[in-house]
A protein has these predicted regions:
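Non-catalytic cell-wall polysaccharide-engagement segments
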Residues: 49-52, 57-64, 75-81, 165-274
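N-terminal export signals and maturation junctions of secreted/periplasmic proteins
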Residues: 19, 23-32, 37, 44-93
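Short loop/turn segments at secondary-structure transitions that flank enzyme active sites
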Residues: 114-115, 123, 188-191
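Protein-protein interaction and targeting regions used for scaffolding, dimerization, and localization
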Residues: 1-27
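Binding-interface segments
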Residues: 131-182, 189-192
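Short, functionally critical alpha-helical segments immediately adjacent to catalytic or ligand/cofactor-binding
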Residues: 100-115, 147-168, 185, 219, ...
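Short, solvent-exposed loop/turn and secondary-structure capping segments
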Residues: 117-127, 196
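Export/targeting segments at the very N-terminus of extracytoplasmic proteins
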Residues: 61-115, 132-151
Length: 274
């Protein structure tokens, strides 16, 4: 005998409510699962981005650009690396192929311009005692208050400290032929001499010295003085090489910048090429 189940209106309402709750609950759970998946994917993507960025920041030790036997240990950006390659290219062309010699030159340039060819701009934030140490008798007649006023006007400052030195004759030569390039070429005489050596009109266009290729040509010509690259002494280590080229860059004699150039040698090493 079949049993007939009779449902009241209240029973039907409860049943329908249960079905709706079940449906909504499943949707909510599905949404939760989707959100969780999206969050995982976002987290994974962010982690990849972070790893990629960190790798890019610290990629110098693994850098395998055209630097010959010189291994870059410093944290250089792409512009600096390109300029280091330029320097090594022109050193090789001039016959400077010994890696210790190359590191000596690069260490001086690291100190002078950090591989970004530039013009001397201002000593406004340099202490008077430091300025007196750098320029000596050229500023000895100025009191501290006069020095404070002088260094606030860069053009006047360079016309004073570079007046009638290294071929400058006054009339704005100090400002016009202030330090530029990778190794901070200074003075009209040097602009003329090294411009002639590399076939560039640096006297007529001194800002040309800040072009990376020209800056590399100037630096190599300055350090070799037109001699073959193999004419340098055999250096025992990086420190000896950096000290030697710091002295050349200062015009001879023990350079006051020796310590800075020597400190920069740690940015470079010699590749173990077998």
């Amino acid at each position: 005998m079949k049993r007939i189940i009779r449902l009241t209106e209240q029973d039907l309402t409860g049943l329908l409510k249960g079905i709706v709750d079940l449906a909504l609950g499943g949707t909510a759970n599905n949404k939760k699962d989707v959100t969780s998946k999206d969050e995982k994917e976002t987290t994974s993507t962010d982690e990849k981005k972070t790893t990629s960025t960190d790798d890019k920041k610290s990629d110098t030790p693994n850098y395998n650009g055209d630097t010959g036997k010189v291994f870059l240990k410093g944290n250089f950006d792409s512009t600096q690396k390109a300029n280091i390659e330029l320097m090594i290219k022109y050193m090789n062309k001039s016959g400077i192929k010994d890696p210790l010699t190359q590191i000596g030159v690069l260490s001086v340039i690291s100190k002078e311009s950090n591989f970004r060819p530039k013009s001397e701009v201002s000593y406004a934030n340099t202490s008077n005692s430091r300025i007196r140490k750098i320029f000596g008798s050229r500023v000895s007649k100025y009191s501290d208050s006069e020095m404070d006023s002088l260094k606030k006007n860069p053009e006047r400052f360079f016309n004073v400290v570079y007046a009638k030195t290294v071929g400058n004759q006054g009339g704005g030569d100090g400002w016009k032929y202030r330090g530029r390039g990778f190794n901070q070429l200074t003075g009209k005489k040097n602009y003329e001499k090294y411009g002639n050596m590399i076939g560039r009109n640096l006297v007529g266009n001194p800002d040309l010295a800040n072009d990376p290729t020209v800056a590399a040509e100037i630096a190599v010509a300055f350090f070799t003085k037109g001699k073959p690259g193999n004419a340098f002494p055999k250096f025992k280590n990086k420190t000896e090489a950096a000290a030697h080229f710091a002295d050349i860059n200062s015009g001879g004699g023990a350079s006051r910048h020796r310590a800075d150039a020597i400190a920069a040698v740690d940015k470079f090493d010699i590749k173990d090429i077998t």
